[in-house]
Amino acid sequence: MRIILDAMGGDNAPLAPVMGAIQAAKDFGAEIILVGRGEAILEVLKGNGIDTLPEGVEIANADDVVDMHDDPARVIRQKPNSSMVMGLKMLSDGKGDAFISAGSTGALLTGATLLVKRVKGIRRAAMGPAMPNKAGGKTIILDCGANAECTPEFLLQFGLVGSLYAKKNLSVENPKVGLLNIGTEDTKGTPLQKEAYALLKDAGDNGLINFVGNVEGRDVPLGAVDVVVCDGFAGNVLLKSIEGTAMFMGSLMSKMFKKNLLSKLAAMLVMKDIKAFKKLLDYREIGGTPFLGIRKPVIKAHGSSDALAFRNAVHQAMDAVNSDITAELEQMLGSMKENGNDD
Protein backbone atom coordinates (compact mmCIF):
# COMPACT_ATOMS: atom_id res chain seq x y z
CA MET A 1 0.00 0.00 0.00
CA ARG A 2 1.34 3.42 -0.99
CA ILE A 3 0.09 6.66 0.51
CA ILE A 4 0.77 9.89 -1.39
CA LEU A 5 1.31 12.89 0.88
CA ASP A 6 1.41 16.56 -0.10
CA ALA A 7 4.59 17.72 1.63
CA MET A 8 3.96 21.39 0.90
CA GLY A 9 0.35 21.75 2.06
CA GLY A 10 -0.67 23.32 5.37
CA ASP A 11 0.54 25.98 7.79
CA ASN A 12 3.40 23.83 9.10
CA ALA A 13 4.74 22.46 5.82
CA PRO A 14 7.09 20.96 4.95
CA LEU A 15 8.19 20.13 8.51
CA ALA A 16 4.94 18.63 9.81
CA PRO A 17 4.01 16.44 6.81
CA VAL A 18 7.57 15.18 6.38
CA MET A 19 8.07 14.24 10.03
CA GLY A 20 4.55 12.83 10.25
CA ALA A 21 5.24 10.65 7.23
CA ILE A 22 8.45 9.32 8.74
CA GLN A 23 6.68 8.46 11.98
CA ALA A 24 3.82 6.78 10.09
CA ALA A 25 6.23 4.70 8.02
CA LYS A 26 7.89 3.55 11.23
CA ASP A 27 4.69 2.89 13.19
CA PHE A 28 2.44 1.42 10.48
CA GLY A 29 4.86 0.07 7.88
CA ALA A 30 3.31 2.27 5.23
CA GLU A 31 5.02 3.16 1.97
CA ILE A 32 4.78 6.93 1.61
CA ILE A 33 5.48 9.19 -1.34
CA LEU A 34 6.25 12.76 -0.28
CA VAL A 35 5.30 15.10 -3.11
CA GLY A 36 6.96 18.51 -2.97
CA ARG A 37 10.14 20.48 -3.37
CA GLY A 38 12.85 17.89 -2.97
CA GLU A 39 15.44 20.27 -1.54
CA ALA A 40 13.02 21.57 1.10
CA ILE A 41 12.11 18.02 2.14
CA LEU A 42 15.77 17.00 2.43
CA GLU A 43 16.50 20.12 4.50
CA VAL A 44 13.79 19.09 6.96
CA LEU A 45 15.33 15.64 7.27
CA LYS A 46 18.82 17.07 7.73
CA GLY A 47 17.57 19.56 10.32
CA ASN A 48 16.15 16.67 12.34
CA GLY A 49 19.31 14.58 12.21
CA ILE A 50 18.16 12.27 9.40
CA ASP A 51 20.83 11.85 6.73
CA THR A 52 19.01 9.48 4.38
CA LEU A 53 15.39 8.77 3.53
CA PRO A 54 13.96 6.13 5.88
CA GLU A 55 12.85 2.81 4.42
CA GLY A 56 9.43 3.06 2.82
CA VAL A 57 9.61 6.82 2.20
CA GLU A 58 10.39 8.36 -1.18
CA ILE A 59 10.26 11.81 -2.75
CA ALA A 60 8.43 12.89 -5.91
CA ASN A 61 9.69 16.34 -6.82
CA ALA A 62 7.12 19.09 -7.42
CA ASP A 63 8.38 22.62 -7.95
CA ASP A 64 5.17 24.55 -7.32
CA VAL A 65 2.78 24.97 -4.37
CA VAL A 66 -0.96 25.66 -4.21
CA ASP A 67 -1.68 28.46 -1.75
CA MET A 68 -4.90 29.63 -0.15
CA HIS A 69 -5.28 32.56 -2.56
CA ASP A 70 -5.30 30.40 -5.69
CA ASP A 71 -8.60 30.03 -7.54
CA PRO A 72 -9.63 26.36 -7.04
CA ALA A 73 -11.16 26.22 -10.51
CA ARG A 74 -7.89 27.25 -12.15
CA VAL A 75 -5.31 25.40 -10.07
CA ILE A 76 -5.06 22.36 -12.35
CA ARG A 77 -4.31 24.49 -15.40
CA GLN A 78 -2.23 27.19 -13.73
CA LYS A 79 -0.22 25.00 -11.35
CA PRO A 80 0.12 21.55 -12.95
CA ASN A 81 3.52 21.06 -11.28
CA SER A 82 2.27 21.84 -7.78
CA SER A 83 2.54 19.21 -5.06
CA MET A 84 -1.25 18.95 -4.73
CA VAL A 85 -2.04 18.57 -8.43
CA MET A 86 0.86 16.18 -9.04
CA GLY A 87 -0.19 14.08 -6.04
CA LEU A 88 -3.77 13.82 -7.29
CA LYS A 89 -2.55 12.87 -10.77
CA MET A 90 -0.36 10.16 -9.25
CA LEU A 91 -3.37 8.81 -7.37
CA SER A 92 -5.48 8.85 -10.53
CA ASP A 93 -2.71 7.07 -12.48
CA GLY A 94 -2.49 4.28 -9.91
CA LYS A 95 0.91 5.25 -8.51
CA GLY A 96 -0.57 5.32 -5.02
CA ASP A 97 -3.67 4.17 -3.14
CA ALA A 98 -4.68 7.34 -1.26
CA PHE A 99 -3.81 11.03 -1.12
CA ILE A 100 -3.50 13.40 1.85
CA SER A 101 -3.16 17.18 1.84
CA ALA A 102 -3.54 20.00 4.34
CA GLY A 103 -3.70 22.55 1.54
CA SER A 104 -6.63 24.56 0.18
CA THR A 105 -9.91 22.70 0.70
CA GLY A 106 -11.51 24.13 -2.43
CA ALA A 107 -8.54 23.30 -4.62
CA LEU A 108 -8.30 19.79 -3.19
CA LEU A 109 -12.00 19.09 -3.73
CA THR A 110 -11.93 20.48 -7.27
CA GLY A 111 -8.77 18.57 -8.10
CA ALA A 112 -10.09 15.33 -6.64
CA THR A 113 -13.33 15.69 -8.59
CA LEU A 114 -11.67 16.48 -11.92
CA LEU A 115 -8.61 14.24 -11.70
CA VAL A 116 -9.53 11.28 -9.48
CA LYS A 117 -13.25 11.50 -10.38
CA ARG A 118 -16.38 10.75 -8.41
CA VAL A 119 -17.79 7.28 -7.89
CA LYS A 120 -20.08 6.40 -10.81
CA GLY A 121 -23.54 7.75 -10.03
CA ILE A 122 -22.43 10.14 -7.28
CA ARG A 123 -23.48 13.71 -8.05
CA ARG A 124 -21.40 15.53 -5.43
CA ALA A 125 -18.56 14.48 -3.15
CA ALA A 126 -19.05 15.41 0.50
CA MET A 127 -16.77 16.15 3.43
CA GLY A 128 -17.53 13.68 6.21
CA PRO A 129 -15.62 14.19 9.47
CA ALA A 130 -16.20 11.67 12.26
CA MET A 131 -16.84 13.43 15.57
CA PRO A 132 -16.63 11.71 18.99
CA ASN A 133 -19.96 11.43 20.78
CA LYS A 134 -21.32 10.81 24.26
CA ALA A 135 -22.23 7.21 23.41
CA GLY A 136 -18.53 6.39 23.05
CA GLY A 137 -18.55 6.10 19.29
CA LYS A 138 -18.27 8.56 16.43
CA THR A 139 -20.84 10.44 14.40
CA ILE A 140 -20.21 11.24 10.73
CA ILE A 141 -21.50 14.65 9.66
CA LEU A 142 -21.91 15.15 5.93
CA ASP A 143 -21.73 17.42 4.20
CA CYS A 144 -19.48 19.73 6.24
CA GLY A 145 -18.61 22.39 3.72
CA ALA A 146 -18.04 20.99 0.25
CA ASN A 147 -21.56 21.82 -0.97
CA ALA A 148 -23.19 24.88 0.55
CA GLU A 149 -26.26 24.43 -1.64
CA CYS A 150 -27.78 20.99 -2.11
CA THR A 151 -30.71 19.23 -3.73
CA PRO A 152 -32.75 16.52 -1.97
CA GLU A 153 -31.02 13.96 -4.21
CA PHE A 154 -27.62 15.11 -2.95
CA LEU A 155 -28.74 14.59 0.65
CA LEU A 156 -30.03 11.12 -0.19
CA GLN A 157 -26.64 10.17 -1.60
CA PHE A 158 -24.89 11.64 1.45
CA GLY A 159 -26.98 9.27 3.56
CA LEU A 160 -26.03 6.29 1.42
CA VAL A 161 -22.29 6.96 1.31
CA GLY A 162 -22.20 7.97 4.99
CA SER A 163 -23.92 4.75 6.02
CA LEU A 164 -21.48 2.63 4.02
CA TYR A 165 -18.50 4.52 5.44
CA ALA A 166 -19.77 4.02 9.00
CA LYS A 167 -20.13 0.29 8.36
CA LYS A 168 -16.76 -0.22 6.73
CA ASN A 169 -14.54 2.30 8.53
CA LEU A 170 -16.17 2.70 11.94
CA SER A 171 -17.37 -0.91 12.24
CA VAL A 172 -20.97 0.08 12.98
CA GLU A 173 -23.14 -2.91 12.09
CA ASN A 174 -26.37 -1.06 11.26
CA PRO A 175 -25.63 2.69 11.21
CA LYS A 176 -28.47 4.98 12.21
CA VAL A 177 -28.92 7.79 9.70
CA GLY A 178 -30.61 11.05 10.68
CA LEU A 179 -31.51 14.22 8.77
CA LEU A 180 -30.46 17.46 10.48
CA ASN A 181 -33.52 19.61 11.05
CA ILE A 182 -35.11 22.13 13.44
CA GLY A 183 -37.35 19.47 14.95
CA THR A 184 -37.93 15.73 14.90
CA GLU A 185 -41.38 15.84 13.28
CA ASP A 186 -41.46 14.84 9.59
CA THR A 187 -43.30 18.07 8.73
CA LYS A 188 -40.45 20.29 9.93
CA GLY A 189 -37.95 22.20 7.81
CA THR A 190 -37.71 23.89 4.44
CA PRO A 191 -38.77 22.21 1.18
CA LEU A 192 -35.21 20.82 0.96
CA GLN A 193 -35.50 18.97 4.26
CA LYS A 194 -39.04 17.77 3.56
CA GLU A 195 -38.16 16.36 0.14
CA ALA A 196 -34.91 14.85 1.42
CA TYR A 197 -36.83 13.27 4.30
CA ALA A 198 -39.15 11.51 1.83
CA LEU A 199 -36.21 10.19 -0.22
CA LEU A 200 -34.29 8.99 2.83
CA LYS A 201 -37.40 7.35 4.27
CA ASP A 202 -37.98 5.54 0.98
CA ALA A 203 -34.35 4.33 1.02
CA GLY A 204 -34.90 3.14 4.57
CA ASP A 205 -38.13 1.34 3.65
CA ASN A 206 -36.23 -0.45 0.87
CA GLY A 207 -33.52 -1.60 3.27
CA LEU A 208 -30.74 0.52 1.80
CA ILE A 209 -30.10 2.48 5.00
CA ASN A 210 -31.34 2.58 8.58
CA PHE A 211 -33.07 5.96 8.45
CA VAL A 212 -34.41 7.03 11.85
CA GLY A 213 -35.86 10.42 10.88
CA ASN A 214 -35.02 14.00 11.74
CA VAL A 215 -32.47 14.93 14.40
CA GLU A 216 -31.71 18.27 16.02
CA GLY A 217 -28.27 19.79 16.48
CA ARG A 218 -28.19 18.89 20.16
CA ASP A 219 -28.65 15.19 19.31
CA VAL A 220 -25.41 15.01 17.32
CA PRO A 221 -22.81 15.09 20.14
CA LEU A 222 -25.07 12.81 22.20
CA GLY A 223 -24.66 10.01 19.66
CA ALA A 224 -28.34 9.73 18.76
CA VAL A 225 -27.31 8.70 15.24
CA ASP A 226 -24.18 7.45 13.50
CA VAL A 227 -24.62 9.55 10.36
CA VAL A 228 -26.00 13.10 10.20
CA VAL A 229 -27.14 14.24 6.76
CA CYS A 230 -27.21 17.96 5.94
CA ASP A 231 -26.16 20.54 3.38
CA GLY A 232 -22.60 21.83 3.57
CA PHE A 233 -23.59 25.20 5.00
CA ALA A 234 -25.54 23.78 7.95
CA GLY A 235 -22.97 21.03 8.48
CA ASN A 236 -20.07 23.45 8.67
CA VAL A 237 -21.92 25.66 11.15
CA LEU A 238 -22.76 22.59 13.24
CA LEU A 239 -19.17 21.32 13.17
CA LYS A 240 -17.66 24.68 14.12
CA SER A 241 -20.24 25.10 16.91
CA ILE A 242 -19.30 21.72 18.38
CA GLU A 243 -15.59 22.56 18.11
CA GLY A 244 -16.13 25.95 19.75
CA THR A 245 -18.15 24.42 22.58
CA ALA A 246 -15.42 21.83 23.18
CA MET A 247 -12.78 24.58 23.31
CA PHE A 248 -14.92 26.60 25.72
CA MET A 249 -15.48 23.60 28.01
CA GLY A 250 -11.78 22.79 27.99
CA SER A 251 -10.85 26.37 28.85
CA LEU A 252 -13.51 26.55 31.56
CA MET A 253 -12.35 23.30 33.12
CA SER A 254 -8.73 24.49 33.06
CA LYS A 255 -9.65 27.70 34.90
CA MET A 256 -11.67 25.79 37.48
CA PHE A 257 -8.79 23.46 38.29
CA LYS A 258 -6.40 26.41 38.71
CA LYS A 259 -8.70 28.42 40.97
CA ASN A 260 -7.13 27.54 44.32
CA LEU A 261 -4.95 24.97 46.08
CA LEU A 262 -7.85 22.59 46.69
CA SER A 263 -8.91 22.62 43.03
CA LYS A 264 -5.28 22.07 41.97
CA LEU A 265 -5.09 19.02 44.23
CA ALA A 266 -8.35 17.76 42.74
CA ALA A 267 -6.89 18.19 39.26
CA MET A 268 -3.90 16.05 40.21
CA LEU A 269 -6.25 13.26 41.28
CA VAL A 270 -8.07 13.22 37.96
CA MET A 271 -5.17 14.19 35.69
CA LYS A 272 -5.29 10.88 33.83
CA ASP A 273 -8.96 11.42 33.02
CA ILE A 274 -8.33 15.03 31.99
CA LYS A 275 -5.66 13.91 29.53
CA ALA A 276 -8.00 11.26 28.13
CA PHE A 277 -10.72 13.92 27.73
CA LYS A 278 -8.35 16.25 25.87
CA LYS A 279 -7.20 13.43 23.61
CA LEU A 280 -10.79 12.56 22.75
CA LEU A 281 -11.43 16.12 21.54
CA ASP A 282 -8.06 16.60 19.81
CA TYR A 283 -8.49 16.82 16.02
CA ARG A 284 -4.92 15.56 15.62
CA GLU A 285 -5.99 12.15 16.89
CA ILE A 286 -8.51 11.78 14.06
CA GLY A 287 -6.14 12.70 11.24
CA GLY A 288 -8.32 14.42 8.69
CA THR A 289 -11.63 14.58 6.85
CA PRO A 290 -12.32 12.25 3.91
CA PHE A 291 -13.98 13.39 0.70
CA LEU A 292 -16.68 10.75 0.46
CA GLY A 293 -17.88 9.91 -3.03
CA ILE A 294 -14.45 10.13 -4.72
CA ARG A 295 -13.25 6.92 -6.43
CA LYS A 296 -10.11 6.66 -4.31
CA PRO A 297 -9.45 7.91 -0.76
CA VAL A 298 -8.64 11.62 -0.62
CA ILE A 299 -8.19 13.06 2.87
CA LYS A 300 -8.13 16.73 3.83
CA ALA A 301 -5.90 17.26 6.85
CA HIS A 302 -6.48 20.30 9.08
CA GLY A 303 -4.59 23.36 7.87
CA SER A 304 -2.68 23.63 11.14
CA SER A 305 -1.86 19.91 11.34
CA ASP A 306 1.37 18.97 13.08
CA ALA A 307 3.41 15.79 12.66
CA LEU A 308 1.06 13.78 14.92
CA ALA A 309 -1.96 14.79 12.84
CA PHE A 310 -0.23 13.76 9.61
CA ARG A 311 0.86 10.47 11.15
CA ASN A 312 -2.74 9.70 12.07
CA ALA A 313 -3.99 10.88 8.68
CA VAL A 314 -1.77 8.24 7.08
CA HIS A 315 -3.29 5.60 9.34
CA GLN A 316 -6.76 6.87 8.44
CA ALA A 317 -5.90 6.67 4.75
CA MET A 318 -4.68 3.10 5.15
CA ASP A 319 -7.97 2.15 6.82
CA ALA A 320 -9.89 3.78 3.97
CA VAL A 321 -7.93 1.80 1.38
CA ASN A 322 -8.49 -1.47 3.25
CA SER A 323 -12.22 -0.86 3.59
CA ASP A 324 -12.87 0.43 0.06
CA ILE A 325 -16.55 1.27 -0.37
CA THR A 326 -16.44 2.23 -4.06
CA ALA A 327 -17.64 -1.05 -5.59
CA GLU A 328 -20.45 -1.49 -3.06
CA LEU A 329 -21.57 2.12 -3.48
CA GLU A 330 -21.63 1.82 -7.29
CA GLN A 331 -23.67 -1.37 -6.99
CA MET A 332 -26.17 0.30 -4.66
CA LEU A 333 -26.56 3.35 -6.91
CA GLY A 334 -26.93 1.14 -9.98
CA SER A 335 -29.64 -0.89 -8.28
CA MET A 336 -31.52 2.27 -7.31
CA LYS A 337 -31.36 3.56 -10.89
CA GLU A 338 -32.68 0.27 -12.28
CA ASN A 339 -35.58 0.35 -9.82
CA GLY A 340 -36.37 3.97 -10.63
CA ASN A 341 -35.45 5.27 -7.18
CA ASP A 342 -32.78 7.69 -8.41
CA ASP A 343 -34.00 10.84 -10.10
Task: Give residue ranges: language-model regions.
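Glycine-rich phosphate-binding loop
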Residues: M90-L109, K188, Q193-E195, L199, ...
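N-terminal phosphate-binding or glycine-rich loops at protein starts, especially the Walker A/P-loop
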Residues: M1-E43
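Glycine-rich phosphate/nucleotide-binding loop
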Residues: T113-G137, I141, A224-V228, G232-D342
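Short beta-strand segments
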Residues: D6, V35-G36, E58-A60, S101-G103, ...
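Short, glycine-rich nucleotide/cofactor-binding loops
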Residues: I3-L15, A146-L156, K300-A307
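Glycine-rich phosphate/diphosphate-binding loop of Rossmann-like nucleotide-binding domains
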Residues: P14-A16, F28-I33, E39, D51, ...
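Phosphate/nucleotide-donor binding subsite
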Residues: I50-G96
